[in-house]
């Protein structure tokens, strides 16, 4: 490390012990978690952007890797692939997903796609609302077939609804739509006793 006058604020220059020609500068880009690493060697300039760079740059013990960012599982390393003479050096010792990318500053800048996202969200919400409305209306218009909320067979109640008048039938449907509370135990017992008595009276030979 040299004096603070030569290096600007927020810049850290690292020189590995193996090769003094390689100079690295690591800068913290404001209002982001991205560390920008500038690599200069023989008038070649590369910029490495590591999105998960949360620690300062450290010299990697491996010979193929110049330095690594962080000491965690998802380690991003800058290797000799920046020389373009050994392109396989980047892949050595790293997994496919953990290879550092070479990006420009234009790619770093956040895109103003907030309006597009809002439009997409509204269109998706509208589609979901339409589909939910269609499903609800179709299930209501199908009638009273199948099983009800409390698990009892609706076909049992159809026999009772046939003898009742249309007005009472409509009032029952409206009351069930308005009041979503399930039936009480007393109502259930009454209905069960009515069905049992009706079945027994039909089966008894006279």
From Swiss-Prot:
One of its GO terms (molecular function) is RNA binding. The keyword Mitochondrion does not apply. InterPro entries: Pns11/12. GO terms for cellular component: host cell cytoplasm. Residues 87-206 are annotated as: Disordered. Residues 109-132 have a biased composition (Basic and acidic residues). It is found in: Host cytoplasm. Keywords: Host cytoplasm, RNA-binding. Transmembrane segments: none annotated. Its main location: host cell. The keyword RNA-binding applies. Belongs to the phytoreovirus RNA-binding protein family. Constituent of viral factories. Binds to ssRNA and dsRNA. This is RNA-binding protein. It comes from Rice gall dwarf virus (RGDV).
């Amino acid at each position: 490390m040299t004096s603070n006058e030569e290096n600007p604020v927020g810049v850290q220059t690292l020189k590995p012990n193996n090769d003094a020609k390689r100079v690295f500068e690591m800068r913290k880009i404001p209002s982001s978690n991205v560390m920008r690493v500038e690599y200069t060697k023989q008038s070649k300039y590369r910029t490495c952007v590591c999105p998960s760079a949360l620690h300062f740059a450290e010299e990697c013990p491996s010979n193929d890797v110049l330095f690594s960012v962080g000491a965690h599982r998802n380690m991003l390393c800058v290797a000799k692939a920046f020389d373009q003479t050994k392109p396989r050096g980047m892949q050595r010792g790293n997994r496919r997903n953990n290879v550092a990318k070479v990006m420009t500053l234009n790619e770093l800048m956040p895109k103003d796609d907030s309006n597009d996202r809002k439009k997409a969200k509204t269109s998706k919400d509208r589609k979901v609302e339409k589909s939910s409305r269609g499903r609800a209306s179709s299930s209501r218009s199908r009638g009273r077939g199948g099983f009800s909320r409390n698990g009892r067979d609706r076909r049992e109640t159809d026999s009772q609804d046939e003898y009742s008048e249309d007005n009472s039938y409509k009032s029952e449907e409206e009351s069930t739509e308005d009041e979503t509370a399930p039936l009480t135990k007393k109502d259930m017992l009454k209905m069960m006793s009515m069905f049992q008595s009706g079945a027994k009276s039909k089966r008894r030979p006279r």
